[in-house]
């Protein structure tokens, strides 16, 4: 009796958090990641992000037991992972990894049904409850219409859906997914992550998934863990994680190239002195700025209010941004700075459709451009293709 109690004490070390790691080091001949500390809550979706080769897959393999830790402990619902029997673990934890199985003579339904193995009896016969679970997983992953097709004939995206359906079919309390959105088109990526979010919330499942699509991770994840340089670089909520400083440190880029409002990186800004001045606001200049960047034309932008969509993008792409406090009429200082910048340019792009009380003074820039005999265009497309609204076309 005492031996059994002691054994239980060794296995049950702390309250039953769905999935945790304590001082985890993982790798092969040598550690790839070290000192990993993770606590994941039920009913949440955690995104694992980081550069290629940083150790995301290594962490996931260690969390599910497919790679033995070099040091530290993985804990599943309060029990050490190493102490759990394979079948018991499979009833609690399901995994989708990046391997690409190619079973012969099996239908898509057969592959999904394999997820019920931990719950079936000795002969592997499916009950009505098992078949209901299979059908629900097929529906969740939108593959009911292809479930009778040979798995080997499916596209990569269809196989991806089927393998995730197999993991869901296990009805786990912990779901580990390595790059679940790979091979999926944009619409399917959105559907998949929305489904996983609902699954976490409605069933109380703890889900952790590695994602390279940062814009999707920012929108879908309750919690974000960033992996870099041999360990956890930072972790926290999406709001805390997706900052310019964190993204710059994580991926080794210019901080201004990451746009937290869009959750995306921008291409490198053109170099050199500004040759075009853009007057924009409220998103009216987004396409014009991107067009100038694609053509490698340096530009200045203003006068933009703090927090405006165009202001956010201009900070990443423009060589100079003249701005003014949000919700306030444009300051005289900003107008003078903008006029000075405009005089050094060869053309003005007037992206605004209209002006109001707070940005009306931008019209001073339009008049100043005409006074300086600078050509004025309604868009970047017109600048490159003509005709100009005023003046003569510049040479770039």
Language model: regions and residue ranges:
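Helix-to-loop junction immediately C-terminal to a conserved catalytic motif
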Residues: 64
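Conserved ABC transporter NBD signature motif
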Residues: 72-80
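ABC ATPase nucleotide-binding domains
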Residues: 252-333, 350-352, 359, 377-396
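Conserved ABC ATPase "signature" region
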Residues: 113, 128-146
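Conserved catalytic motifs of ABC-family nucleotide-binding domains
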Residues: 171
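Conserved ABC ATPase signature
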Residues: 125, 150-154, 158
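Catalytic Walker B motif of ABC-type/P-loop ATPase nucleotide-binding domains
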Residues: 175-179
């Amino acid at each position: 009796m005492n031996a059994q109690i002691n054994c239980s004490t060794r296995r049950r070390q702390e309250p039953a958090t769905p999935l945790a790691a304590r001082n985890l080091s993982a790798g092969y001949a040598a550690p790839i990641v070290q000192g990993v500390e993770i606590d994941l809550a039920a009913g949440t979706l955690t995104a694992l992000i980081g550069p290629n080769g940083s150790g995301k897959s290594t962490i996931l393999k260690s969390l599910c037991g497919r790679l033995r830790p070099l040091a530290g402990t993985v804990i599943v619902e309060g029990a050490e992972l190493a102490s759990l029997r394979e079948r018991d673990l499979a009833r609690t934890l399901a995994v989708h990894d990046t391997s690409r199985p190619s079973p012969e003579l099996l239908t898509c339904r057969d592959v999904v049904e394999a997820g019920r193995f931990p719950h079936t009896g000795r002969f592997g016969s499916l009950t009505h409850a098992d078949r209901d679970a299979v059908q629900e997983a097929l529906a969740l992953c939108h593959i009911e219409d292809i479930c009778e097709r040979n798995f080997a004939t499916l596209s990569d995206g269809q196989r991806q859906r089927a393998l995730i359906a197999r993991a869901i079919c296990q009805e786990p309390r912990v779901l580990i997914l390595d790059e679940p959105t790979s091979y999926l088109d944009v619409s399917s990526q959105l559907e998949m992550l929305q489904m996983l979010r609902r699954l976490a919330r409605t069933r109380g499942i703890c889900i952790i998934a590695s994602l390279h699509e940062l814009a999707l991770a920012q929108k879908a994840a309750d919690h974000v863990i960033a992996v870099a340089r041999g360990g956890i670089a930072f972790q926290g909520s999406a709001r805390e994680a997706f900052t310019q400083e964190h993204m710059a440190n994580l991926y080794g880029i210019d901080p201004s190239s990451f746009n937290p409002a869009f959750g995306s990186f921008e291409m490198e800004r053109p170099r050199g002195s500004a040759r075009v001045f853009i007057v924009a606001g409220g998103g009216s200049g987004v396409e014009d700025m991107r067009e100038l960047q694609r053509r490698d034309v340096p530009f200045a932008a203003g006068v933009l209010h703090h927090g405006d969509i165009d202001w956010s993008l201009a900070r990443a792409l423009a060589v100079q941004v003249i701005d003014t406090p949000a919700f306030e009429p444009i300051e005289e200082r900003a107008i003078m700075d903008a006029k000075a910048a405009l005089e050094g340019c060869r053309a003005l792009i007037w992206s605004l459709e209209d002006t109001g009380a707070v940005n009306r003074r931008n019209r001073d820039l339009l008049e100043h451009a005409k006074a300086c005999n600078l050509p004025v265009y309604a868009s970047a497309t017109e600048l490159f293709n003509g005709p100009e609204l005023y003046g003569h076309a510049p040479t770039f």
